Structures are given as C-alpha cells and as structure tokens.
Amino acid sequence: MFSWMGRQAGGRERSGGMDAVQTVTGGLRSLYQRKVLPLEEAYRFHEFHSPALEDADFENKPMILLVGQYSTGKTTFIRYLLEQDFPGMRIGPEPTTDSFIAVMYGETEGSTPGNALVVDPKKPFRKLSRFGNAFLNRFMCSQLPNQVLKSISIIDSPGILSGEKQRISRGYDFCQVLQWFAERVDRIILLFDAHKLDISDEFSEAIKAFRGQDDKIRVVLNKADQVDTQQLMRVYGALMWSLGKVINTPEVLRVYIGSFWAQPLQNTDNRRLFEAEAQDLFRDIQSLPQKAAVRKLNDLIKRARLAKVHAYIISYLKKEMPNMFGKENKKRELIYRLPEIYVQLQREYQISAGDFPEVKAMQEQLENYDFTKFHSLKPKLIEAVDNMLTNKISSLMGLISQEEMNMPTQMVQGGAFDGTTEGPFNQGYGEGAKEGADEEEWVVAKDKPVYDELFYTLSPINGKISGVNAKKEMVTSKLPNSVLGKIWKLADCDCDGMLDEEEFALAKHLIKIKLDGYELPNSLPPHLVPPSHRKSLPKAD
C-alpha cells in the first residue's frame, strides 16, 4: 500500500507490488489535492474543522493512539509491545507521562522536541503547531531501532486527571489535540484499570472528542489479573454500562481483557482467557498495515462529505445575509436557527443527518466570523467532489483490494508479537487436539483403561461395537448431533461403520476435547491416529 510496506521479514521487495503501492498512495493524495482541497479552501474548512492534509499524512505508517486515566498502564503497554524502553518513558503509580510522545522508528535512539518536530516535512505532525508552545513543550517524538516500529507508530498520551485543574493547567485544549490525533490514527485504544475502574468527567469529555471515529476505538481492560473471576465479571459489566453512557453507538465496543506487562500474573485463574484476549488484540494490531490504505480512503471519503456539508452551510449563511443594514441581528438570528437550517439543507440536498457537524460547536465558532465575507455556493467545486466519490474512488478500491491480497496477514513483527508465534508458547500449543503431538506414546492411551471398561459394557461383537451402541454412549455428552457426527467421522478410521476399542477411545477423547472448550480438527492429526490403524492410513503431506 505504501512504500514503507514494500519489504517483508526477509528484507526482499515483493515482486510486482510496488507499482500498485505507489499508485494507491499517489492516487489518494492526488484526489485530495485536486478535488477536495479547493472546496475546503473556498469555505474555510480548515478554520472550522481540520487542517489541510499534507504528503506525510498519506505516506505515514499506521498509528495507534493510547488514551486513559493516569496509572492505567499506557506507557507500560507500549513497553510490553516493544519489549524495550524508549526515550522519555516514565512509569509509576503517580501521574508520570505529562506529554504526548510519538514513539516511532529511527536508526538511532533519540528524541525530538515538539517545536522541531512540527517543522519536519517527513513527519505527519506539522499542523499541530496551531496548538501553540504550551502544547509543543509537552510533545516529543521518541525514536528507536525497534522492529515493531518498522510497521506501526504509537502515540502515548498524558494520563487524564480529575478536577478543574486537568482542564486549566495544561495551557492547551487537550480534547482538541485528541480529536486531531483521532482523525489521523488507525486505531484508538482506551485503557482502563480493572482494579480501580473509573470514568471521570474529564475522561468522558476526552472520549466524546472521538465522535465519528467509533470504528477505530478498541477498549483494553488492563490489570485484570489483580481481581478474581467473580470480581472481573462485575468490573466488566460496570465498564460496559459506563461506556454505554459515554459512547453513543448501538454497536458494542470490543473489549480486550488481560494484564499487558511482562510480569507474573497475580491471579492465574483466568490465564487462558488472558492469553486468548492478548492474541486477539495482537491480530487486530497486526492487521493495521494491511488495512491502512482502506482506512485512509475511508477518512478521505468522510472528510469530503463533511467538506460538502460545510460548503452548503457557509453558502446558505452568505445567501441569507442582507446587503446593507441589520447584519449583526441577522447573524445572531441565523446562528440561533442553525438547527433548523441543518434540517432544511438535509431535505434540499438529500444529506444524512450524520454528515453534519455538531450544532453547538458550529454555533460557537460562527460567532467569530463575518458572514458577509463567506463565499456563495460554487457548483463546480461540489460537482468535482461528487465525481470523485462516484467514479474515482471505485478505481482506487480495485487497486487496494489487489494489494491487500498480495500482502502478508501479519506484517507487525518483533517485540511481544514474536513471543507467541512459534514454539511451545504459541497459543493453543499442546492443548486440545494438539495435545500429545510431541510425544511418542499415543496421547489417548493414558485414559484408555477407563474407556475400555465402557467399551465392553456396549456388547462388542468380534471386537467392535455398532454405530447404534456407540451412539447411546456418545449422546450422554449432550453435545449436538452435528458435533457428534463429526467426531464419529474422525474416530471411524477404517470407515466400516463400527468402532473397535481404540477407535472408541479416540471418540471419547475427542468428546473430552470439545467439552473442554477446544475446537475439533477438520481432519485427524497423525498423532491422534490409533496405533493399529496408522499403517492403513495415507501419510500426511
């Protein structure tokens, strides 16, 4: 998709992929500069909503924004992923991280202060200069040669405090900065502490700054090993209830539960759950490079739709203003009537209500502008954006889909991502149907004496029991017939419609695997084949 994605783990360029990569990147940039940017500039979009996009915004790596109250483990989470300290890292139970830190790849380890960072054209942070020195003094880029950072960048944010001091003492609009990052990152991770769950008013306001970016949000319930299973259920329920009041979306947010640091678990009752949740989160993060172009395309479409709506609003206000007298009174009236104007424009141009900016914020911003200096509606600019949305985007989608098919599914490597991919600590290694794969003895043999006793109560004839008799025993597991049917096919190795004592023991073993919560294999692994049947089966490839 992007030039930095052109190398796989072995360091060799993918053949035939780079042309499509550059086409997608250049296509997105070209569409924005030729179609969307003129519309934004004509109606002061950048003053009301978001600064203009630059080349670095299209070419940068996928970014992850971490947000949470103080001491929820944001910085520790980054260290857990990288398995390495980074410049500017401070960890402790008190509010430690007081700055926004962009953790990015660099050939040498070091840090760049905010004022120098916003003048670097290769970094996607130039537009942050509008937040002033109060913010730039609390912003830095931490660079280090870490393999994880070759594929993604991570933004660490200051811990959110409670009280009025949180809002006043920073010297910059914290929520506006979060909103700026939210528009540009690929994933927003909200971290909560399971041991002291709380969503303060300040945190609620920060979450509301992510309005319109709901598809990027993931939730991590961290430090879950500090509570037992019963407490964890209560904490999870309280978290979902609290989030439901803050995030106005009908969809349920994905919550990952675990303990994301490289220390022993304090409570091991839910170890298997934590491992599965960590792998799910890793897979989500590893998918970001593959989906980066789609995300940027999606953000460009959302931006274009908002730019159109903004143009309709501004041009309507311009049209309603008198030429001579009563301008201030008319301005106040139009601002007051803005909700009605929204409804009118929705009907006139067949626009969804969800495409309109928030009324209250728009009213506050309009107070500072002279409506007579706004431009009238320019149909050609609107038509150019409509043509882009209708025709140009579809051709890019084809290129993106082709590139995604050629990319590896797990591009993020190194750090914690390598710790569970191979060897005995891979998720599910030696568990379920994989148990006994490394052992010489047949894994079913240890329980076979118990299964043999059952087998001989089922009236075997010539050393085998019929399907009818086997069914009587198998249905006692209360598993669905569809599952038992699959187990029968796997266990009946010679396909004679009957089970000998080894096949019956195998069937009971597979039932146990399913009852323990593991998935059944689609075909019988070689180590599960009964010893007396191994010669008759074809060797696995």
From Swiss-Prot:
Annotated family: Belongs to the TRAFAC class dynamin-like GTPase superfamily. Dynamin/Fzo/YdjA family. EHD subfamily.
Residue numbers spanned by region G5 motif: 246
Transmembrane residue ranges: none
Gene3D superfamilies: 1.10.268.20, EF-hand, P-loop containing nucleotide triphosphate hydrolases
Assembly information from the UniProt record: Homooligomer, and heterooligomer with EHD1, EHD2 and EHD3. Forms a complex with EHD4 and MICALL1; the complex controls CDH5 trafficking and coordinates angiogenesis.
Any one of the GO BP annotations: cell migration involved in sprouting angiogenesis
Protein name: EH domain-containing protein 4
Function: ATP- and membrane-binding protein that probably controls membrane reorganization/tubulation upon ATP hydrolysis. Plays a role in early endosomal transport. During sprouting angiogenesis, in complex with PACSIN2 and MICALL1, forms recycling endosome-like tubular structure at asymmetric adherens junctions to control CDH5 trafficking.
Phosphoserine PTM sites in chain numbering: S15, S162, S459
Binding site for Ca(2+): D492, D494, D496, M498, E503
Chain intervals for the UniProt region annotation (G2 motif): 94-95
Boundaries of every EH domain copy: 447-535
Organism expressing this protein natively: Mus musculus (Mouse)
Domain (Dynamin-type G) ranges: 58-289
Region (G4 motif): 222-225
Record localization: Early endosome membrane; Recycling endosome membrane; Cell membrane; Cell junction, Adherens junction
